[in-house]
C-alpha cells in the first residue's frame, strides 16, 4: 500500500536505520517491521491476516483511525485514506498503549 507520513520524524525513522524514535531500539525495529508489512500489503485485508499486528478500528473521537501493535506496549496509529484501488495509509503516530 502507498504510505503518507503525517510526522516527518516517523518518515525519517522508517527510512534511516540510524534514526531513533526515542522509545527504544526494540520499538524502532518493530516500527520498521510493521512498515514493511504495510508497504507489502495490497489492501487492509492483508493487514488483518497478520494476527500478531492486532489490526483494529479505534473508538470514540478516533473512530476514523486504526491501530497496529508494534509490541505489547506500543502501537502504530494509522488512517486509511481514499478509495480502492488508490487507497493510502496515513501514518499518524507511535503511542504507548497503556
What is the predicted role of each segment?
Residues 3-4, 51, 87:
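Residues that recognize and position ribonucleotide moieties
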Residues 43-66:
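A short, surface-exposed loop/turn module that caps and links secondary-structure elements
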Residues 1-36:
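Arg/Lys-rich, positively charged N-terminal/basic patches that mediate binding to nucleic acids
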Residues 26-33, 50-53, 69:
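Generic alpha-helix structural propensity
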Residues 38, 42:
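Basic, amphipathic alpha-helical segments enriched in Lys/Arg and hydrophobic/aromatic residues
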Residues 1, 8-11, 45, 53-56, ...:
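Flexible, active-site-adjacent loop/turn segments at secondary-structure boundaries
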Residues 59, 66-98:
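Enriched for short, Lys/Arg-rich terminal
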Amino acid at each position: 500500500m502507498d504510505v503518507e507520513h503525517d510526522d516527518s520524524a516517523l518518515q525519517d525513522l522508517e527510512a534511516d536505520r540510524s534514526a531513533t524514535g526515542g522509545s527504544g531500539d526494540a520499538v524502532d525495529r518493530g516500527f520498521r517491521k510493521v512498515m514493511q508489512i504495510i508497504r507489502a500489503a495490497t489492501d487492509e485485508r492483508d493487514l488483518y491476516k497478520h494476527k500478531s499486528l492486532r489490526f483494529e478500528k479505534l473508538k470514540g473521537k478516533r473512530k476514523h483511525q486504526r491501530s497496529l501493535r508494534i509490541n505489547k506496549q506500543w502501537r502504530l496509529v494509522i488512517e486509511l485514506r481514499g478509495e480502492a484501488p488508490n487507497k493510502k495509509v496515513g501514518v499518524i503516530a507511535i503511542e504507548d498503549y497503556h
